[in-house]
Amino acid sequence: MSDSTSETVKKAIIKQVLIESQSANARTLMEKIGENCFTSCVPKPGSSLSNSEKTCVTQCTEKYMAAWNVVNTTYLRRIQQEMGNQ
């Protein structure tokens, strides 16, 4: 295999791993939001959510999403830097 073909294959594999990692991270995020926000905001589940429960879940979800975006952006930047150094 030539160096250029090897490099192309390597980049394709890295790209696929990143996509799968992002998908797994999104699933984990949704699980954590469900576990933490719902548990914290809805102490006694009923047939519907009260306005305060809806507000709490919304704010909690937004907080988790913002934190995840910061972590994900930092992670991707680091991966890109490492790819550039190779």
Curated annotation (Swiss-Prot):
Stored InterPro entries: Tim10-like, Tim10-like_dom_sf
Membrane topology: Peripheral membrane protein
UniProt xrefs under Pfam families: zf-Tim10_DDP
Keywords annotated in UniProt: Chaperone, Disulfide bond, Membrane, Metal-binding, Mitochondrion, Mitochondrion inner membrane, Protein transport, Translocation, Transport, Zinc
Placement of sequence motif Twin CX3C motif: 37-60
GO MF annotations in UniProt: metal ion binding; protein transporter activity
GO biological process: protein insertion into mitochondrial inner membrane
Subcellular location: Mitochondrion inner membrane
Disulfide pairings: 37-60, 41-56
Main location: mitochondrion
Any one GO cellular component localisation term in the record: mitochondrial intermembrane space protein transporter complex
Source superkingdom: Eukaryota
Subunit comment: Heterohexamer; composed of 3 copies of tim8 and 3 copies of tim13, named soluble 70 kDa complex. Associates with the TIM22 complex, whose core is composed of tim22 and tim54. Interacts with the transmembrane regions of multi-pass transmembrane proteins in transit.
Similarity section: Belongs to the small Tim family.
UniProt comment concerning the protein's domains: The twin CX3C motif contains 4 conserved Cys residues that form 2 disulfide bonds in the mitochondrial intermembrane space. However, during the transit of tim13 from cytoplasm into mitochondrion, the Cys residues probably coordinate zinc, thereby preventing folding and allowing its transfer across mitochondrial outer membrane.
Protein name: Mitochondrial import inner membrane translocase subunit tim13
Species per Swiss-Prot/TrEMBL record: Neurospora crassa (strain ATCC 24698 / 74-OR23-1A / CBS 708.71 / DSM 1257 / FGSC 987)
Organism phylogeny: Eukaryota, Fungi, Dikarya, Ascomycota, Pezizomycotina
